[in-house]
């Protein structure tokens, strides 16, 4: 697990580097599917002092199997998503400013241009609000459940992120670094959408044929973007 702990540590350290977190906000995890174990950031530990050895290993029930610290308070959300979506290898949660603003407004981040379409096939959805019962019960688990409810049967890697109403963004990918990459993009397109709608409040969504082209040339079966 040392290699995965190092990867998760490095991915967590990318959050302050890209301006996605303040203080100890945010967390990144990754899963070892063969062992059924998840590595995640410890709760409330400052990035400035955090080390790879501080990463916490939990099983799929959330029991700590390795580590001196308590795991992130959002661990149950991560685990619920890993259980539901076998294609996920890494998950990140932040409170990045612009993506969180869309979450607090209760609005999906609209697909307005090709930067968005290069990564997200359509709007980045916003979940419904959790009920008082859901919040007072197993809050973090129910956060995972409402994300799943919102995504439905969609392929999560085609929509590698979501904003949870009144809370903030979650993003995911094939591994921890990919998840952080998608979180960075989500923050950027959230900012772009806010600016664009401020310039033109009547701005419509990107044309569907242009969105399809940009997403499929990068992620489709005949993708030709980048190097092999």
From Swiss-Prot:
Its cofactor is Zn(2+). Pfam families: Aldolase_II. Substrate binds at residues 26-27, 43-44, 72-73. InterPro entries: Aldolase_class_II_sugar_metab, Aldolase_II/adducin_N, Aldolase_II/adducin_N_sf, UlaF. One of its GO terms (molecular function) is L-ribulose-phosphate 4-epimerase activity. Pathway: Cofactor degradation; L-ascorbate degradation; D-xylulose 5-phosphate from L-ascorbate: step 4/4. Keywords: Carbohydrate metabolism, Isomerase, Metal-binding, Zinc. GO terms for biological process: L-ascorbic acid catabolic process; L-ascorbic acid metabolic process; pentose catabolic process. Gene3D superfamilies: Class II aldolase/adducin N-terminal domain (3.40.225.10). It comes from the Bacteria. Zn(2+) binds at residues 74, 93, 95, 167. GO terms for cellular component: cytosol. Transmembrane segments: none annotated. The active site is at 118 (proton donor/acceptor), 225 (proton donor/acceptor). The keyword Isomerase applies. Induction: Induced by L-ascorbate. Repressed by UlaR. Its EC number is 5.1.3.4. The keyword DNA repair does not apply. Binds 1 zinc ion per subunit. It catalyses: L-ribulose 5-phosphate = D-xylulose 5-phosphate. Belongs to the aldolase class II family. AraD/FucA subfamily. Catalyzes the isomerization of L-ribulose 5-phosphate to D-xylulose 5-phosphate. Is involved in the anaerobic L-ascorbate utilization. This is L-ribulose-5-phosphate 4-epimerase UlaF. The lineage of its organism: Bacteria, Pseudomonadati, Pseudomonadota, Gammaproteobacteria, Enterobacterales.
């Amino acid at each position: 697990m040392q290699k995965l702990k190092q990867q998760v540590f490095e991915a967590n350290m990318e959050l302050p580097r890209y301006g996605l977190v303040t203080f100890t906000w945010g967390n990144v995890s990754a899963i070892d599917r063969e062992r059924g174990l998840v590595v995640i950031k410890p709760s409330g530990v400052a990035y400035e002092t955090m080390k790879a050895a501080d990463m916490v290993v939990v099983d799929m029930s959330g029991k700590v199997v390795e580590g001196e610290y308590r795991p992130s308070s959002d661990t149950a959300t991560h685990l619920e998503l890993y259980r539901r979506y076998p294609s996920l290898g890494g998950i990140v949660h932040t409170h990045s400013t612009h993506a969180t603003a869309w979450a607090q407004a209760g609005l999906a981040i609209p697909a307005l241009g090709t930067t968005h379409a290069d990564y997200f096939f359509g709007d980045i959805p916003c979940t419904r609000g959790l009920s008082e019962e859901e919040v007072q019960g197993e809050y973090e688990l129910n956060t995972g459940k409402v994300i799943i409810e919102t995504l439905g049967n969609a392929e999560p890697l085609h929509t590698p992120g979501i904003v949870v109403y009144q809370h903030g963004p979650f993003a995911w990918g094939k591994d921890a670094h990919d998840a952080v990459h998608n979180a960075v993009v989500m923050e950027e397109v959230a900012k772009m959408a806010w600016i664009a709608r401020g310039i033109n409040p009547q701005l419509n969504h990107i044309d569907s044929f242009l969105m399809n082209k940009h997403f499929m040339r990068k992620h489709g079966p005949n993708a030709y973007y980048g190097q092999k």
